[in-house]
Amino acid sequence: MFDLVIKRANLADGKGEVDIACQSGKIVEIAKSVLGESKEIIEAEGCLLSPPFIDPHFHMDATLSLGTPRLNVSGTLLEGISLWGELKPLQSIDDIIARAMKYCDLAVAKGIGAIRSHVDTCDDELKGVQALLEVREKVKDYLDLQLVAFPQDGVIRDSTALRNTKRALDMGVDVVGGIPHFERTMSEGASSIKLLCEIAAERGLMVDMHCDESDDPMSRHIETLAFETKRLGLEGRVSGSHLTSMHSMDNYYVSKLIPLMVESKINVIPNPLINIMLQGRHDTYPKRRGQTRVRELRDAGLTVGFGSDCVMDPWYSLGKADMLDVAFMALHVGQLSSREDMEWCFDAVTKNSAKIIALEEYGIEKGKPANFVLLQAKDKIEAIRLRAHRLLVVRNGRIISRSNPIEHTLYKPEGKTVFNELS
């Protein structure tokens, strides 16, 4: 007897409806019709069954802190960093844990199966590190949480950041992070990349660097990151997050830069909701969109995955843990409007991001863990168009979130009409 069978589900490959049988936490059969009894049967009725959404870039130590101690009035990255500096001394480890656990509940209900969260390493108490290591343990049965040691104030600029970043890694943080564009000078930014990549190489860790989150076309730290990746043999293990300055760079320089990134197999993590909000703040009109060159980077063969970055924190007042909101924004800002492009945007919040964070055994295939989300949509494009309702979230063959389909009832002169938004 199976533990769970999903009947008549459409998979992301668009090849038609199938049944999926789960037993002992694994997918044991995928067929047009699965025969045999099951403890529970779910009728998908042609809805899309997707692998879990993956968020490759988030700040869980800051999430849901909106308004403490004040709001970001200018809406800029730099005021957000300043505001975060005011907030850090006011929060306790328990505060961070409580907010993070609430966010994890939101994320799971929205079908997120894994989050890579940066955690600030510039306070001697390492409050965020202590808190999120505890959260990682608490949520491990239903959410994969990968942590990045992130020296928010600059690993060189802040006198204790290097020591504390190493302490965080010793405590069990997974990935080496950095922020070269926030160092005092371009040369110190380059030095910080060299230093942090060497630490990652020595420890056998991945790197995820906030890089060139600026409108300044001369912010070119991604070039140094690509060089150090190649020099240290870190190909495929390094991600450049944001890369917003590429939006403003000279096309000739970009034509030289992208092949260097390809040679180093750099992963790319734009954060569309935040990039479109924070960038271009010094512009009048025309006003820059700020999102990096997604199409060109993808077409060059680089792995591109979209992150959500922030939800209700010093940098962003909105958000609801919805990776389809992220894909929806990326599609518009990047003018990714062909059917192939729109379907790829769905991949950028699922399988591409899973590859970036090196998530093992991901996908809906026989023998893999039974991790998936059932969406109230027929295919990937409709899922993005509707930011589709999550009907079911399954982790290791166990239903961990369930909700009823959304329907609308209209009362018209000729009578009552019940419908949903599916095409």
Summary of predicted features, one role per range:
Residues 1-36, 380:
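N-terminal metal-binding scaffold of metallo-dependent hydrolase/deaminase domains
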Residues 64-96, 172-175, 221-239, 262-267, ...:
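Active-site gating loops and adjacent loop-to-helix segments of metal-dependent hydrolytic enzymes
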Residues 66-118, 126-138, 163-170:
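Alpha-helical scaffold segments that flank or form the walls of functional sites
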Residues 83-98, 148-159, 180-187:
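Active-site mouth loops of central-metabolism enzymes
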Residues 127-141, 158-267, 283-306, 362:
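Histidine/acidic residue-rich metal-binding segments in metalloenzymes
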Residues 206, 227-238, 274-278, 288-375:
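His/Asp/Glu-enriched, well-ordered alpha-helical/loop segment
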Residues 355, 366-422:
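C-terminal cap of metal-dependent C-N hydrolases
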